[in-house]
């Protein structure tokens, strides 16, 4: 998989995974996704603030400017760390227990005649996210209590 396609897959996974409280107990995705979304929104402002702060208070200090640039770069790279993790996670095959759970949810959705994602070999976390998204919209709330 190409380096930049991992980031794109991470963004797709971020947008697909349902942020249900019950899922947060089982999977780390909820915490990672909230942190990544927060970083995508606010880290560009932190980067700009770091440079502007340096320009206001230490205008002619090259060492302070280089530290401000490094701080800005670090702030801008934080969302990419989350997207990279999510992209890798999306393409990871499910563990055995999660795969059993995946097929159980698929059976429930098949009973409602819902189209399901095509799975060639072993389902991945992206497939699980797609099925959970459908389950969130098509199955009753009691489903989330059973988890």
Curated annotation (Swiss-Prot):
Cellular component GO terms held in the UniProt record: plasma membrane
Does Cell membrane appear among the keywords?
yes
Per the UniProt record, which residue ranges are transmembrane? 38-58, 67-87
Cellular compartments annotated: Cell inner membrane
User: What's the protein's topology in the membrane?
Assistant: Multi-pass membrane protein
Q: List the InterPro entries hit by this protein, alphabetically.
A: UPF0208
Superkingdom of the source species: Bacteria
Q: State the UniProt keywords alphabetically.
A: Cell inner membrane, Cell membrane, Membrane, Transmembrane, Transmembrane helix
By sequence similarity, the record places it as follows: Belongs to the UPF0208 family.
The protein, known as: UPF0208 membrane protein HI_1205
Organism of this sequence: Haemophilus influenzae (strain ATCC 51907 / DSM 11121 / KW20 / Rd)
